[in-house]
Swiss-Prot record:
Keyword Calcium: no
HAMAP family assigned to the protein according to its UniProt record, in alphabetical order: LpxB
GO function terms (MF aspect): lipid-A-disaccharide synthase activity; phospholipid binding
Entry's EC annotation: 2.4.1.182
Superkingdom as given in the UniProt entry: Bacteria
Pathways per UniProt: Bacterial outer membrane biogenesis; LPS lipid A biosynthesis
Stated name of the protein: Lipid-A-disaccharide synthase
Keywords annotated in UniProt: Glycosyltransferase, Lipid A biosynthesis, Lipid biosynthesis, Lipid metabolism, Transferase
Function noted in UniProt: Condensation of UDP-2,3-diacylglucosamine and 2,3-diacylglucosamine-1-phosphate to form lipid A disaccharide, a precursor of lipid A, a phosphorylated glycolipid that anchors the lipopolysaccharide to the outer membrane of the cell.
Gene for this chain: lpxB
GO CC terms in record: membrane
The species this protein was found in: Shewanella baltica (strain OS223)
This protein's record includes keyword Lipid biosynthesis: yes
Single Gene Ontology BP annotation: lipid A biosynthetic process
Catalysed reaction, written as an equation: a lipid X + a UDP-2-N,3-O-bis[(3R)-3-hydroxyacyl]-alpha-D-glucosamine = a lipid A disaccharide + UDP + H(+)
Amino acid sequence: MSNKTPLVFAMVAGELSGDILGAGLMAALQKNHPDARFVGIGGPRMEALGFRSLFAMEELAVMGIVEVLSRLPRLLTVRASLIKEITALKPDCFIGIDAPDFNIGLELKLKARGIKTVHYVSPSVWAWRPKRIFKIAKATHMVLSLLPFEKAFYDQHQVPCTFVGHTLADDIPFQSDKAAARALLGLDADAEYLAILPGSRGGELKQLAEPFVKAALLIRQNFPDIRFVTPLVNQKRRDQFEQALKDFAPDLEIHMIEGQSREVMAAADGILLASGTATLEAMLVKRPMVVAYRVSPITYRIAKRMMQVERFSLPNLLAGKDLVPELIQEDCTPEKIAAAVTLELNRDFAPLKAEFEALHQVLRRDASLKAAEAVMALVEPKHTQAKSPEAN
């Protein structure tokens, strides 16, 4: 029997997708280390597994350059407090999950204090601000990438990186059952549905709720019997979306559901959604989609100068070609959205579905286990080899 002290992991997740990844990693680590302790910033899924949050995850859920600037004093206060708390804790490893503008600075400080650091989810250094890779190299002992082309970029710059695949590809079946999803959600078995996903952040709904609901009015002209369903991450976002509906399309009926975004996508015949992780989920569920995004004009002008790629949705980035329509900024209008959705709902989906299936295979690698193995390989020198049989 071992009398070693339990492993301690500090982690910071900045939004819903990070909470999902963090919970998967925690569960994989707990299989071989059931007494491990986890502390930092996490969401409800992580907390359900015993994670102790020092701050609410909502503190970090900020989008856009302008929006971040308005919250900067608070973000800096949170980061300074975390540096102090985590340094005193002396964890076996710190794992920053996504949120690169917050986490990489935190990792830099912690690594300088002798703490092992891992960044889970590569920042889009291949897409914009590529020189960030040099800061990442200084800040981390290892990057865990979700996408296959990212590792090649890190290898080129001699920065340690492990491609682990994506937990969504592990969790989502190759064939999503539309009938079962509709039964679960209480939706009509025979109706045609468009899922509308305007994002999980307040800033996203502020930008996208209006063009999305106005587009729905136009789509209804082309498909008089179509129905709309929208998953919203919490009551705050629901209130925000309901207000947009009241302001811009008071006669439009949209069935709103709290959470269950994956089930809503599986139940739909097509999807209109904000750019982000949800586009990957829509691809894995294998439904036709239109991707749209809009930020403040200043944020967009600054970001556009830094962009290194022409595509921004994950299905198109993974494929290296245009699989799904992308409507960004000035193209994110009700008219263009409605036209794109109409085209996607009318076209033969079989060729696109085959592309989605091939990409699903590439990403399905048991990501949480692979991530846990990579973390333990880094932690191992601090613990006896016998402590972690999964590393063998």
